[in-house]
Amino acid sequence: MTKKYVVALDQGTTSSRAIIFDHDANIVSVSQREFTQIYPQAGWVEHDPMEIWASQSSTLIEVIARSGIHASEIASIGITNQRETTVIWDKQTGKPVYNAIVWQCRRSSEICEELKSQGLEAYIRDTTGLLLDPYFSGTKIKWILDNVSGVRERAERGELLFGTIDTWLVWKLTEGKVHVTDPTNASRTLLFNIHTQSWDKRILEALTIPESLLPQVKPSSAVYGKTRIAGEGGEISIAGIAGDQQSALFGQLCTEPGMAKNTYGTGCFLLMNTGEKAVKSNHGLLTTIAIGAKGEVNYALEGSVFMGGATIQWLRDELGLIRDAQDTEYFASRVESTNGVYLVPAFVGLGAPYWDPSARGALVGLTRGSNRNHIIRAALEAIAYQSRDLLDAMAKDSGVELKKLKVDGGAVANDFLMQFQADITSVEVQRPAVTETTAMGAAFLAGLAVGFWDSTSELKHRADIDKSFMPSISEEQKDELYAGWQKAVSQTING
């Protein structure tokens, strides 16, 4: 049969999805399943790797069955994933030795402090482009090796494998035949030299991590292996891998230096492509690996906010202020302002540009007149304020004053948030017609690897803009609002 489709597996922090795209990059079918969030104690976040696999494999089977497409019509599968989340498993049985430690988890803070005391902070920053923070995989691996009975001994005997979620899924899809990752995911481990594009022996020694645990690093657009899980029709090539944020950057076709996007998901992630130059940040951002127009390694500046959409989940699940995330736009629009209320959602510390794991959330400026609408509006505004923090830092590091910001992720459907983002940054915010840019990036990579598409120039017609949001408030208003935010943040950092 003719190859007519590409499948993207989008393994996120709260759900696993499978999306089928046709040759025009239109969405044909979608399947999604949520999975359990595990919070063993304050600041700890885990997932069950087997539940992730069950949810992801079932969506793949379901999306093909639901669409009526024959597996033989699928050219390839691309994978995009929550980054940094850490899985270690037995290479013979395939059984994880512990739950996956999620990117949000802060349990390895003491390990980070220990590395700082050894004087390794500058070396790690220069080599990996990352900060010494519990966010990244390296210290999570060490925590498992040091704290789960018998695991270090098994690792040193070569019995175990490590992977971020992309690696885990490829290993499962290929029935244990393939242990790989790509440069975008490798660059988030704290173990990868982004300049030589290889695992760094000095950091591995400092963390006492056996190199035998680590996957082979292959290009983001390449055939890694085949899977038989998708039903009748033979094997399907697995041909694209990218961490979720780099995948979104590629899906938005930000393949040239100076192009940037912000993804509004569980967290918020602002990335700017810097081309072949790895720009070192002096303002709390990360230097990471991105993907160029031909699938080659590019570099990017990245700012990460831990609590984006997760802040809205908190309003719903813990406070009961809303029934659905979509309700926030209605409630926020019922008041002219927050009336001085600011929410700083530092529930698991603060990410870029502050990097303070000890910061805790705060709701400030409350008066007797403060109500549900003010708090909900403050939660939405907090997402935009945190993104403004990143944008300011990026401009200082890169020397580029952004005029346009491409956006994607679930929260971009919220017109109130998008307009406030434009207002508080004085930047035009562009929402694409197809907002599934993270999955689309994985599909593009997988399709390009097998010749389903010839080049990214063939894909540029998919970059249509649904709506542009232009700044609409005065500089004075903007500065006053942002000063209030900065004051609120300072209270969470300084106690």
Swiss-Prot record:
Regulation: Inhibited by fructose 1,6-bisphosphate (FBP).
Record: residues binding sn-glycerol 3-phosphate: T13, R83, E84, Y135, D244
Enzyme Commission number, as recorded: 2.7.1.30
Catalytic activity: glycerol + ATP = sn-glycerol 3-phosphate + ADP + H(+)
Keyword Cell membrane: no
MF-aspect GO terms: ATP binding; glycerol kinase activity
Binding site for ATP: T13, T14, S15, T266, G309, Q313, G410
Entries under CDD domains matching the protein: FGGY_EcGK_like
Swiss-Prot/TrEMBL keywords: ATP-binding, Glycerol metabolism, Kinase, Nucleotide-binding, Transferase
Matches recorded under InterPro entries: ATPase_NBD (IPR043129), Carb_kinase_FGGY (IPR000577), Carb_kinase_FGGY_CS (IPR018483), FGGY_C (IPR018485), FGGY_N (IPR018484), Glycerol_kin (IPR005999)
Listed pathway(s): Polyol metabolism; glycerol degradation via glycerol kinase pathway; sn-glycerol 3-phosphate from glycerol: step 1/1
Residues the entry annotates as binding ADP: T13, R17, T266, G309, G410, N414
Entry binding sites for glycerol: R83, E84, Y135, D244, Q245
GO biological process: glycerol catabolic process; glycerol metabolic process; glycerol-3-phosphate metabolic process
GO CC list: cytosol
Record flagged with keyword Translocase: no
NCBIfam families with a match to the protein in the record: glycerol_kin, PRK00047.1
Family to which the UniProt record says this protein belongs: Belongs to the FGGY kinase family.
The protein's role, per its UniProt record: Key enzyme in the regulation of glycerol uptake and metabolism. Catalyzes the phosphorylation of glycerol to yield sn-glycerol 3-phosphate.
Protein name: Glycerol kinase
